[in-house]
């Protein structure tokens, strides 16, 4: 019996039954219509909503990327300008420092030359004064010596005493 039941089942599945095909097709169409009415709209709506969300995210990502690239370009330009400006400022600072150093050096050299000239003039004046004083002293001594010579008669001892006296006078006046 088992064998005959299996054969019956196998025979009915393998042989096309027009009623079964009809009812299967009707059931498929009904299920398809029910799914279309109940589930197809929400599924398609959810898929479209999801697609819009994804497209919106992609668009935002593209615009953010473009915006960040624009900001990056602008920052690079600003950085290049800042570098150029800093180089210019440094160059101007160095030029100013060089000019200032040259001016200060020139002024210092000029001042040193003036000080040297002033010192030379003062030394020359002091030298002249000293020579004038020395001449006056020598003249005074010569006059005094001549006075002494004239007042007394000169012998060898007397001459020696006069010269010694003049030397003493000269040394006491210097000190």
From Swiss-Prot:
Looking at the record's lineage, which domain of life comes first? Bacteria
Key word Aminoacyl-tRNA synthetase present? no
Q: Please give the Gene Ontology molecular function terms for this protein.
A: proton-transporting ATP synthase activity, rotational mechanism; proton-transporting ATPase activity, rotational mechanism
What membrane topology is annotated for this entry? Single-pass membrane protein
Protein localization: Cell inner membrane
Q: Which residues cross the membrane?
A: 20-40
Q: Which InterPro entries match?
A: ATP_synth_B-like_membr_sf (IPR028987), ATP_synth_b/b'su_bac/chlpt (IPR002146), ATP_synth_F0_bsu_bac (IPR005864), ATP_synthase_B_chain (IPR050059)
Q: Which GO CC terms are listed, alphabetically?
A: plasma membrane; proton-transporting ATP synthase complex
Entry keywords, A to Z: ATP synthesis, Cell inner membrane, Cell membrane, CF(0), Hydrogen ion transport, Ion transport, Membrane, Transmembrane, Transmembrane helix, Transport
The protein's job, in short, is: F(1)F(0) ATP synthase produces ATP from ADP in the presence of a proton or sodium gradient. F-type ATPases consist of two structural domains, F(1) containing the extramembraneous catalytic core and F(0) containing the membrane proton channel, linked together by a central stalk and a peripheral stalk. During catalysis, ATP synthesis in the catalytic domain of F(1) is coupled via a rotary mechanism of the central stalk subunits to proton translocation.
Q: Summarize subunit and interaction data from the UniProt record for this chain.
A: F-type ATPases have 2 components, F(1) - the catalytic core - and F(0) - the membrane proton channel. F(1) has five subunits: alpha(3), beta(3), gamma(1), delta(1), epsilon(1). F(0) has four main subunits: a(1), b(2) and c(10-14). The alpha and beta chains form an alternating ring which encloses part of the gamma chain. F(1) is attached to F(0) by a central stalk formed by the gamma and epsilon chains, while a peripheral stalk is formed by the delta and b chains.
The record's section on NCBIfam families has: ATP_synt_b, PRK14472.1
Family membership? Belongs to the ATPase B chain family.
Protein name as it appears in the record: ATP synthase subunit b
Source organism of this protein record? Pelodictyon phaeoclathratiforme (strain DSM 5477 / BU-1)
